[in-house]
């Protein structure tokens, strides 16, 4: 993978942000094979498009001059800065790395700053420029502060003054001042560390995390690398902090962990008895490729394995970024037979309340039916919808007491030979497949955004298909849990030590 014929390195704000999140990304971007890198997902593309639209809106609302090096009057960033234009949009500055130690084999290093804007602070006679980041988010994030600090650092090389504040414009369009001194102090170290990583002879050792890696284009490569080099890292419950504890105890494989005793692991600093039980059981399940039962399921988290006259499986599609629940899907089951799928869709976000009321009415037609869902999102979203649309607390309580979270049932009742306790991973282990193989929560949000933009009904059909399959996957899991016959439960003292995965 590595190419020793290195070209000069150009460091941008996205490079620094990627390095701050994961040291392996800049290394792979420089040395990795393009065949191992995935194209950005449609959801990532949508986020970029939303940011561009927001930037355009801000530029209209707060006029300035946009950088255009091809303009006959010379609209380069330095030229516009010399003119002290009040607002400069889409700025582009490039400077050599100023006096920082970098590896000798790195070659020339350039810093390329492309802030969304620069704003002149001061009078016509004296002052300085400060950087601007325009983001479509609702709240300030550390990444935005780091990007502003990088732009301020580069500005300091251009105008002989390093601004210690920057402007951040979020979804509401308000211009917020952000203090940058803390991040500015870290920029030189981050740049030096990035240089050391990209010139290293070996790829950085990192620990995958679902929340951090889910949108990374190198995710599949890193997962395959871990599977080949150290499968123990992919075992649920083996975290960044627990992995070195296990290795120091001489446990370097799933098989060794499966054979370890709880008494052996419990005294280890950083583990304890609960984590020890969890890890050993997960290793036993994965090593044997069989479920390991923790306790009987009946009554667990409200779960009743016996078929009910009517059962409902429920799944919500929502865009938390824009605060809209656009599809509430309900699968209706009578006496163990799927009867119907109800797609309660909001083609217009303004119809959300209508969809919510339709769901309440539908669920109240079957007041004794349990409502199966997977994970806490449905409960949390129903609470938000009830508050948003003025649902009586008693009515909401009657609804939520019928909810049965199958994620809780699984993680408290059985250990499975899988890498992740997501609905897709569990259902696929059970042999269930989604009709749209690339579908997912992020793809759902993208489809809804595309529907709003194009009014192409195909996007709504894809949404409904994906949501229905989520409901059917939930029911498939419920069936399996009801049909499976756990052996004798663990002893009472061991049951008390189990913690969810």
Where are these regions (language model features)?
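Conserved DEDDh/DEDDy metal-dependent 3′-5′ exonuclease domain
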Residues: 89-99, 112-116, 125-173, 177-197, ...
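Charged, glycine-rich intrinsically disordered N-terminal tails and low-complexity linkers that flank
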Residues: 1-65
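C-terminal extensions
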Residues: 43, 222-236, 244-249, 255-356, ...
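Acidic, Mg2+-coordinating catalytic module of metal-dependent nucleases/exonucleases
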Residues: 179-223, 229, 426, 430-495
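Catalytic cores of nuclease domains that cleave nucleic-acid phosphodiester backbones
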Residues: 45-134, 291-324
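Flexible loop/turn segments at secondary-structure boundaries
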Residues: 35, 319-322, 378-382, 411-413, ...
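Short linear loop/turn motifs
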Residues: 72-74, 261, 279-281, 437-449
